[in-house]
């Protein structure tokens, strides 16, 4: 299945883009999608401090993905 | 969700206006009005700053800020709490966040306002990119919102939400 990763904050800079389409096997989870990013050293360093969301819902690493999901990668926040 | 919560987004690209927040929260049983305005500084950790760009995951951010407002009302027993945060490019002195709390008395208004502002800074998916006079920029290091990360000590000391 195809899932679109959306990078926010510093992760967009580290990924070189704010979006990346990835292809995963059926029954893949958020963790499986994030695992694909570990080859990118700069981005991988940031991942342990990231949260993840689909739409307006935060999701855990074991959350199952569906075809067409847009998975947001949310680094530490700095509003205010 | 209260009906009057639907009238505007908590994340706005336009310059923030305080007056609508005051009008929307006005009530005769509240003698205390506490307001926080966070404005853009011209320095950070010893470096000169020329301007900022805020980005936000708008849908999630709106949802989280609304839940912070509700928590603040419930935990501090204050009838009104509104928070709005700006996104986009902001110059020095521009207001990035307004938070408004109304309460019968000042003690709970001050405490609730601090909780609302600190919670927004630590939980709302907003990112601050600082720009420097030489044209370079960097993202300000912030707070992790993933499960399992401990909140700062001073947020732990505040009343915990009883019904969740």
Tell me the role of every PLM-derived stretch.
Chain A
Residues 1-79:
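Ubiquitin-like/PB1-type beta-grasp interaction modules and other compact soluble beta-rich domains
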């Amino acid at each position: 299945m195809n899932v679109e990763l959306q990078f926010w904050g510093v992760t967009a800079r580290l990924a070189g883009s704010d979006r990346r389409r990835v292809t995963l096997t059926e029954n893949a989870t958020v963790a499986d999608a994030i695992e694909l990013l570990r080859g990118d050293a700069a981005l991988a360093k940031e991942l342990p401090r990231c949260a993840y969301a689909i739409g307006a819902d935060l999701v855990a690493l074991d959350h199952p993905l569906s075809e067409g999901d847009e998975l947001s990668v949310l680094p530490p926040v700095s509003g205010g | 969700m209260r009906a009057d919560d639907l009238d505007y987004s908590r994340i706005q690209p336009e310059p923030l206006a305080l007056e609508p927040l005051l009008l929307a929260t006005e009530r005769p049983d509240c003698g205390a009005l506490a307001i926080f305005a966070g404005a853009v500084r011209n320095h950070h950790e010893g470096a000169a700053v020329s301007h900022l760009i805020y980005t936000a995951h708008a849908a999630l951010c709106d949802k989280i800020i609304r839940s912070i407002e509700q928590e603040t009302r419930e935990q501090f027993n204050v009838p009104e709490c509104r928070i709005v945060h700006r996104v986009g490019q902001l110059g020095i002195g521009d207001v990035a966040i307004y938070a408004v709390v109304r309460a019968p008395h000042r003690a709970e208004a001050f405490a609730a306002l601090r909780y609302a502002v600190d919670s927004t800074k630590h939980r709302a998916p907003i990112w601050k990119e600082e720009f420097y006079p030489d044209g370079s920029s960097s993202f300000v290091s912030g707070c992790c919102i993933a499960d399992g990360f401990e909140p700062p000590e001073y947020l732990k000391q505040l009343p915990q939400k009883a019904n969740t």
